[in-house]
Amino acid sequence: MKSLSLLLAVALGLATAVSAGPAVIECWFVEDASGKGLAKRPGALLLRQGPGEPPPRPDLDPELYLSVHDPAGALQAAFRRYPRGAPAPHCEMSRFVPLPASAKWASGLTPAQNCPRALDGAWLMVSISSPVLSLSSLLRPQPEPQQEPVLITMATVVLTVLTHTPAPRVRLGQDALLDLSFAYMPPTSEAASSLAPGPPPFGLEWRRQHLGKGHLLLAATPGLNGQMPAAQEGAVAFAAWDDDEPWGPWTGNGTFWLPTVQPFQEGTYLATIHLPYLQGQVTLELAVYKPPKVSLMPATLARAAPGEAPPELLCLVSHFYPSGGLEVEWELRGGPGGRSQKAEGQRWLSALRHHSDGSVSLSGHLQPPPVTTEQHGARYACRIHHPSLPASGRSAEVTLEVAGLSGPSLEDSVGLFLSAFLLLGLFKALGWAAVYLSTCKDSKKKAE
């Protein structure tokens, strides 16, 4: 009985895992509106359905209501693992026309410029983005929608390109690892049989977008001979198929490694997989950061007499990136009433100081107003907020000492003890010297 319960629990767990994530992805079909800009129409991807018929969608054009068949499983697997609390993904569909790759280094993928007849027909490019993934898929829909029992169009996934790190954040000076995977299934048996058994040749391209232009960082065509552009900035890619099944489907890896990231390397990265006449591309946004260090001067005590202003306080905020988004706040903690409040006084910030590693530093200044006796023991704090820090920020503080209201400090007590110890030793030494001299005089008198 226990084993039956265990099997039931495992089955329920597996069913939950399989059914996780959205079953339907709402999309927008985007097309050119005959010179009047872009037109958008609603569509949807039905990734899976329960028992029975697909849910009817009378609000959609049947050609844009797609029941997705994914032989390689990459598209559906990405959404089975989609976190429940994550925002809904943004999805766009558009027409796609199979063409040879335009880059010269990828010309070996398509020796014949004419697209094979096996790739004729309608194609759709689906681009999906969210905080947890960026995905591009090529779908081949059936020519006509299925009429019964629900108006819906069957579509087969041919190529999927995917990253699970669409917005990587890398600490300044550390290596960036941008993951990329892809999956391919030949669209027809004729297309598969026209090629040699095993996965087809492919091209991998990584670019960084800068001022509207793509800067090529790395290009590779594993298994093909030919002159390739040299990799830039020490970039390396793990470009290979994961398996060598004779007829597919196949999965591959195009993960990108960039060493010792600097600020100029942040921005938009475009990863493209080229197959013969087919392409898929995803976008990643790389952000570089370095959390600031904070220190306060004077470091321990700020002394002032009643009615006098304490010395100027200097908050050093050092070696951080990016330079924007920094806030410096001054607080008075433990003042009258024991509460924390915004510190009064004149405050200003210095200009940014730039360092060789791309980070910056600045200093915040506060000239407090004259103090009162009630403020003795209060603490001035410099709190900083920066995009690289938690919401609470980071702070440093110094204690305010009002003259005449405090007993001797620990340092003073230690000094007094040492002084007393030295005086005691001196007195004892003088006493021993006096006794010695007296003894010597008595000895001389007896000798005479």
Curated annotation (Swiss-Prot):
Cellular component GO terms held in the UniProt record: endoplasmic reticulum; endoplasmic reticulum membrane; endoplasmic reticulum-Golgi intermediate compartment membrane; Golgi membrane; lumenal side of endoplasmic reticulum membrane; MHC class I peptide loading complex; phagocytic vesicle membrane; Tapasin-ERp57 complex
Residues that span the membrane, as ranges: 415-435
Annotated Ig-like C1-type domain residues: 292-399
Localisation per UniProt entry: Endoplasmic reticulum membrane
Mutagenesis / variant outcome for changing Q281S: Decreases cell surface expression of MR1-metabolite antigen complex
Effect of mutating R207E: Decreases cell surface expression of MR1-metabolite antigen complex
GO molecular function, one term: protein folding chaperone
Lumenal topological domain residue ranges: 21-414
Bilayer topology annotation: Single-pass type I membrane protein
Organism domain of life: Eukaryota
Disease (UniProt): MHC class I deficiency 3: An autosomal recessive disorder characterized by glomerulonephritis and markedly reduced cell surface expression of class I HLA antigens. Additional features are herpes zoster infection and polyps of the stomach and colon.
Protein name: Tapasin
Organism: Homo sapiens
